[in-house]
Amino acid sequence: CRGLFVCPTASGKSLIIYGLTRWCHSKNLKTLILVPTTSLVEQMSSDFLDYGWLESYIQKVYSGHSKKIEKDVVISTWQSLHKFPKKYFEQFGCVIGDEAHLFKAKSLTSIMTKLHLCKYRFGLTGTLDDLQTHKLVLEGLFGTTNKVISTKELIEKKTLSNLKIDSLI
């Protein structure tokens, strides 16, 4: 089961990641969630707690935190893990990449390659470069692209405020 989900701002990316994580947990799969910054590790962890997840399931991995995995769900920056050997990644049955458009970076591609036994791969992004090569690389890592909803649809459903731009020139 694989997929690359394009989700604009305010479309509920963290809730989607939480839902995928709960599903993987129900299948007894250890889940690795990769985010680009330590502040996003903290934010994602906090969001999970807000959604009702227990802190005892979540392990945050970044500078100053243990990298020995002892919990079912690991939220980490890719910078904290990219030098680890392939064997380290064999424990994960699911990987979820937040801000997946950044996974074209060599370090991130290296991590995804080391997750060769990982059957469940999901990437989420608010933006996707127009370059066909970039899209093909991401689809190779995560699976086919699925547009969840557009910003226009979110505005029409009144989830987002209407956008109005006045030119000053």
For each of these PLM feature ranges, what is it?
Residues 16-24, 44, 111:
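Hydrophobic residues on the short alpha-helix immediately C-terminal to a glycine-rich phosphate/catalytic loop
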Residues 31, 38-64:
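Conserved helix-turn-beta segment of the N-terminal RecA-like "Helicase ATP-binding" lobe
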Residues 63-94, 105-110:
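Conserved helix/coil segment N-terminal to the catalytic DExD/H
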Residues 93, 101-166:
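Post-DEXD/H (motif II) to motif III coupling segment of the RecA-like Helicase ATP-binding lobe
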